[in-house]
């Protein structure tokens, strides 16, 4: 490890921005806060990330590491302690000056601050807290801040940082505890989930005390995968977890004593519970298990600050997120999505990010990737993640143990529809909103427009096109006034050929020679519209 001292701030910036490029930033701030007199900066709920790098990563935030020094030796990480790279660290004042100067030049709209572990978790978290405190109170920076919580840090440090940040995140790193043990032996699932639960509880108390629901409203407010505060939705046995207990306390307090007194009582009760275990090991009641959802029963409240603090300012108003590496361990897509669903439902996460594994180190435990990083797989996981959060799908609907991976040629929604043709075609003039959402080519906005527009008259295919429906996909799964679009028919092979194309279908048949498919009279592609070169490119990119 080569620790460089007396480096200029420009040299540090070059080293620590490059070291942070593998950490996934947020795609939108998720919180809206207007500017105020005496302060600079504001946050925009939709679009803090305006531009993307060539590899698709967001570059509109100042994304840096506080330090690339680290005590851990994670096999996949470029900053692992065994790597012979130049090490350096910012000071809190340097991060503040950089953020303000970049903001004044209109280079950025916010800060994304992560870090390696410098000396120990508490020391690193103290430095991050000092940085945010100075930015908010001395430099009067009112812009967006996304900060990484350090696993294993003191609960009070994490909690105080949450009142200064807009979003916090703790990287889950890998979907299973076994994978984490193999590739990141210094980290444990317990250390990662403890602050994640603490942030969830703080968000829930703060949102009820201040009267907001994490700043956004989405469909399926009580059933969708990522609804606020849900600790017991994925499995009934999780009903005894601390998140569910908090929900019950809040509900009871609201009904019996009024909203304000109920929220204060809940917060005080959780703070008292945290003080009871403060004398011992705060992780002693947590049990190491391979599936993330099972941890909810052992996690206790770790909120330390009094309820009065939660009444003054919002705690992590943009919610928390996490990141998983795709392709570094042998878990399949079904396992990845099951863990994602569990995180949304048990920990109330706002986003789960996926990062295709990029080999930066040589190690016998790491996979070889002759075809490069699994970017298409990452793309499919993001598409499925969207279906979980906004379309009412469940992981077990999209995949199963018999079909554990996503179709590389079709997006998850089209693939699901082709396997459930018994539910199609859907009559757009009569179908409920939930059913419209499951039609390929229809999104949340277009489905809402259809429901609103059909009150004043019957809709045709031209009307749907004007509303934003992608008829190239939707035409095979809908009817207007009882009629399908001209040239479309409800046949699995026909629809698959039209969506994927002859060249991609042939490739699929070669790669799946053990799969059996009944021959059809309609396999002659000369009977149908010719497939263009642009169609081949679009199918290969997953745009169909």
Where are these regions (language model features)?
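Flexible, acidic/Gly-rich N-terminal and inter-domain linker regions that tether
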Residues: 1-69, 470, 478, 486, ...
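Conserved, mostly hydrophobic/aromatic
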Residues: 61, 74, 113, 170, ...
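Short, charged beta->alpha transition segments
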Residues: 62-64, 93-104, 308-309
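Canonical Radical SAM [4Fe-4S] cluster-binding loop centered on the CxxxCxxC motif
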Residues: 64-93
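Conserved AdoMet/S-adenosylmethionine-binding subsite of the radical SAM
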Residues: 96, 119-391
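Short Fe-S-cluster ligation motifs
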Residues: 98-114, 384
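Long, highly charged, low-complexity intrinsically disordered interaction regions
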Residues: 362-437, 473-526, 532, 543
């Amino acid at each position: 490890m080569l620790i460089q001292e007396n480096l200029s701030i420009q040299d540090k910036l070059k080293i620590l921005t490059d070291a942070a490029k593998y950490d996934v930033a947020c795609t939108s701030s998720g919180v809206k806060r207007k500017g105020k007199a005496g302060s600079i900066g504001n946050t925009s709920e939709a679009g803090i990330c305006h531009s993307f790098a060539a590899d698709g990563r967001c570059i509109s935030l100042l994304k840096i590491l506080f330090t690339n020094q680290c005590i851990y030796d994670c096999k996949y990480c470029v900053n692992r302690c065994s790597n012979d790279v130049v090490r350096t660290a910012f000071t809190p004042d340097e991060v503040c000056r950089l953020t303000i100067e970049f903001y004044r030049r209109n280079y950025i709209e916010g800060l994304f601050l992560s870090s390696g572990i410098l000396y120990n978790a508490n020391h690193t978290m103290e430095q991050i807290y000092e940085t945010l405190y100075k930015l908010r109170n001395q430099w009067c920076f009112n812009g967006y801040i996304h900060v990484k919580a350090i696993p294993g840090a003191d609960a009070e440090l994490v909690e105080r940082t949450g009142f200064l940040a807009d979003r916090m995140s703790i990287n889950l790193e890998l979907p299973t505890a076994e994978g984490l043990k193999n590739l990141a032996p210094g980290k444990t699932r317990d250390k990662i989930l403890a602050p994640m639960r603490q942030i969830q509880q703080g968000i829930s108390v703060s949102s009820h005390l201040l009267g907001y629901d994490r700043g956004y409203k989405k469909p399926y407010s009580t059933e969708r995968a990522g609804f606020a505060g849900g600790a017991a939705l994925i499995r009934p046995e999780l009903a005894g977890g601390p998140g569910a207990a908090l929900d019950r306390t809040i509900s009871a307090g609201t009904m019996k004593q009024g909203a304000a007194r109920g929220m204060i009582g809940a917060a005080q009760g959780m703070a008292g519970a945290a003080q009871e275990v403060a004398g011992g090991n705060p992780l002693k009641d947590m049990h190491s298990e391979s599936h993330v959802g099972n941890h909810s029963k052992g996690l206790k409240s770790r909120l330390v600050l009094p309820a009065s603090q939660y009444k003054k300012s919002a705690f992590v108003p943009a919610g928390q997120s996490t990141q998983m590496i795709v392709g570094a361990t042998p878990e399949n897509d079904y396992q990845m999505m099951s863990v994602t669903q569990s995180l949304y439902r048990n920990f109330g996460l706002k986003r789960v990010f996926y990062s295709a594994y990029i080999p930066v180190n040589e190690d016998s435990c790491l996979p070889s990737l002759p075809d490069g990083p699994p970017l298409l797989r990452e793309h499919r996981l993001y598409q499925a993640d969207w279906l979980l959060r906004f379309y009412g799908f469940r992981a077990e609907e999209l995949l199963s143990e018999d079909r554990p991976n996503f179709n590389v040629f079709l997006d998850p929604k089209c693939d699901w529809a082709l396997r459930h043709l018994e539910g199609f075609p859907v009559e757009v003039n009569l179908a409920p909103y939930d059913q419209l959402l499951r039609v390929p080519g229809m999104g949340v906005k277009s489905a809402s427009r259809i429901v609103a527009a059909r009150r004043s008259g019957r809709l045709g295919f031209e009307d749907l096109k004007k509303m934003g429906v992608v008829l190239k996909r939707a035409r095979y799964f809908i009817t207007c006034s009882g009629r399908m679009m001209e040239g479309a028919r409800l046949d699995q092979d026909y629809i698959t050929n039209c969506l994927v194309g002859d060249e991609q279908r042939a490739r699929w048949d070669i790669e799946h020679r053990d799969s059996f498919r009944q021959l059809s009279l309609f396999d002659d592609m000369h009977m149908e519209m010719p497939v263009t070169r642009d169609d081949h490119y679009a199918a290969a990119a997953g745009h169909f």
